[in-house]
Curated annotation (Swiss-Prot):
Protein name: Small ribosomal subunit protein uS19
Keywords for the protein's UniProt record, in alphabetical order: Ribonucleoprotein, Ribosomal protein, RNA-binding, rRNA-binding
Top-rank taxon, per record: Bacteria
GO cellular component: cytoplasm; small ribosomal subunit
Gene that this polypeptide is encoded by: rpsS
């Protein structure tokens, strides 16, 4: 079930504050976050986020096509190891 339209998109307040401050300062260093559930807003475009995948931080550069998606979609949490050929 998707989120109700009247509630609007979710973003952590501390993350939005960091992005706004970063845009004012014109600095482009990665913003470290554990908030995989936050929706990408248009203000995020052009910034780099270090998104936690449970073990390490994955750098995600936000483009226009990513607006409306979640940060966690671009930081995979599982690594597939190929099945062995000889059995």
């Amino acid at each position: 079930m998707s989120r109700s339209a009247k509630k609007g998109a979710f973003v952590d307040a501390h993350l939005l504050k960091k992005v706004i401050d970063m845009n004012k300062q014109e600095k482009k260093r990665p913003i470290k976050t554990w908030s995989r559930r936050s929706t990408i807003f248009p203000e995020f475009v052009g910034n780099t986020f270090a998104v936690h995948n449970g073990k390490t931080f994955i750098n995600v550069y936000v483009t226009d096509d990513m607006v409306g998606h979640k940060l966690g979609e671009f930081s995979p949490t599982r690594n597939f190891k190929q099945h062995t050929a000889n059995r």
